């Protein structure tokens, strides 16, 4: 049961539940980034750089900065900032993009892939610990709910951009 907060406008029960979910996601995101920073710090990474490596690794194909930003839920500029650092460290490499001369595609270098795998191994231990507290059914239900919410917000965002 949620507490009544007089600073919020009166809303339907459904809207109040979605608001609580959103606030929980904000807190969880902050905590995941903080924990991720601590987890990968010994590897010389931050959560943001780990996410960029992951976006490229999981895509399985070279990606542009906008596509990496989209996969991470950040702006192209935010992704590009991390890509620049990772390129300087020799962890990613820019390749020419035949479809767009000014938007290179990025791949992981062998060092980048090895570092990403080390970060994922560290995360696997954390995930196993969390899996002792959260059932796979709970995790699946939460994922389904959040993916549905993400999909709806993406639709709204596309319509907003078209109207602007």
Stretch-by-stretch model annotation:
Residues 7-8, 84-144:
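Charged, amphipathic alpha-helical coiled-coil/dimerization segments
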Residues 1-13, 136-164:
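C-terminal regulatory/oligomerization modules of transcriptional regulators
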């Amino acid at each position: 049961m949620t507490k009544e907060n007089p600073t919020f406008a009166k809303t339907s029960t459904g809207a109040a539940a979605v608001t609580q979910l959103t606030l929980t996601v904000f807190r969880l995101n902050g905590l995941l980034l903080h924990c991720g920073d601590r987890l990968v710090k010994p590897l010389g990474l931050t959560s943001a750089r780990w996410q960029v490596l992951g976006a490229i690794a999981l895509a399985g194909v070279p990606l542009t900065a906008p596509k990496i930003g989209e996969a991470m839920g950040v702006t192209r500029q935010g992704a590009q900032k991390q890509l620049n650092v990772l390129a300087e460290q020799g962890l990613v490499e820019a390749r020419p993009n035949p479809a767009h001369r000014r938007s290179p595609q990025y791949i992981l270098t062998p060092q980048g892939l090895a570092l990403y795998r080390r970060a994922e191994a560290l995360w696997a231990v954390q995930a196993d610990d969390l899996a002792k507290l959260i059932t796979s059914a709970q995790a699946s239900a939460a994922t389904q709910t959040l993916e549905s919410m993400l999909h709806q917000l993406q639709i709204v965002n596309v319509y907003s951009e078209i109207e602007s």
